[in-house]
Amino acid sequence: APSGPKVKFIPYDDPPKPISAIRPVYPEIAQEAGIEGVVVVQAFIDQKGRVKETIILKGIPNTGLDEAAMEAIRKTRFRPAKQRERAVGVWISIPVNFRLK
């Protein structure tokens, strides 16, 4: 049997769009260790543009980055996906970049 999250694909014409920038808090432990990278989060955005669920698709374990990425996405409001002008709840993948200045 396939493992992993049971993600149903819901067709849509326009994907959800963040209303504001996704701003993760860079964990101190990762900064001190000089860890950079991209965490890919799969998120369910409901028809009101709220983030209902988050799962790590591609993470950087044991650095705090996965949690920081999910937290940042949970705090972001989205314009919901549209299917034929109707708002629909959908799963999308969102890459969150962690770059040291």
Tell me what each language-model feature is.
Residues A1-E32, E71-K75, I94:
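Acidic, low-complexity proline/glycine/alanine-rich linker and hinge segments
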Residues P80-K101:
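Cysteine/selenocysteine-centered motifs that mediate thiol-based redox chemistry or coordinate metal-sulfur cofactors
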Residues P16-K17, L65, A69, L100:
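Low-complexity, compositionally biased segments
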Residues I19, L57-K58, N97:
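Residue-level detector of conserved, well-ordered beta-strand and adjacent loop positions
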Residues I29, A33-V40, I45-K82, G89:
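A short, well-structured alpha-helical segment
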